[in-house]
Amino acid sequence: MADLRLERVLWRHGCQVIGVDEAGRGPLAGPVVAAACILPPDAALPGVDDSKRMTEKRREAAFAAIQAVAVGWGIGIVDAARIDEINILQATFEAMAQAVEGARAMAAARPGRTAEAALLVDGNRPLPLWPGWQRTVVGGDHKSLSIAAASILAKVTRDRMMIEYDAHYPEYGFARNKGYGSREHWDALERYGPCPLHRRTFIGPRQIRFF
């Protein structure tokens, strides 16, 4: 279960700790969404863990709880066209940078001194061009509460977007598959071709039928 041990080390050095994670690197359709979360030292978020280990109902409840507790949080969204333009890795970094900027701006708007920011980034790739201290944490959404909170913010935001997109493109089953490559989704691509939400670089030429 995620906890605050990593954060406490940084808090002792006077840092503002920002957990960073993403959702949606692998789907065939939809955006990649990143989130950044700044928790206070007394944060109490029982049951918050890696978003993939939680039920949808628990994630939704945690989403509201995290927003209520956090000192600052931010969301970054990069759409399919941009993913195709710069590749998924760079798009993920772009979304993360947006999210960190949003979280820091929210925290800065609160009374009190703003401490030097330190990032805890899920995975093994540091955020490029970040000028301050950062640490990558493999499996961080199960180790750091700040990263786990960010993972929930990112996933719930993205899932809600895909459910909304389903109303516009119901043939692809986005509400169910969230843009991932389920059999239903691949069958729909074979039948209808891609829609504007699809990542052209993620699907083979066989499925691409331009309108």
From Swiss-Prot:
Top class in the EC scheme: hydrolase
HAMAP family in the cross-refs: RNase_HII_B
Chief location bin: cytoplasm
Stated name of the protein: Ribonuclease HII 2
Chain ranges of the RNase H type-2 domain: 15-211
Keyword Cell wall biogenesis/degradation included in the entry's annotation: no
Higher taxonomy: Bacteria, Bacillati, Bacillota, Clostridia, Eubacteriales
InterPro entries documented for this protein: RNase_HII (IPR022898), RNase_HII/HIII (IPR001352), RNase_HII/HIII_dom (IPR024567), RNaseH-like_sf (IPR012337), RNaseH_sf (IPR036397)
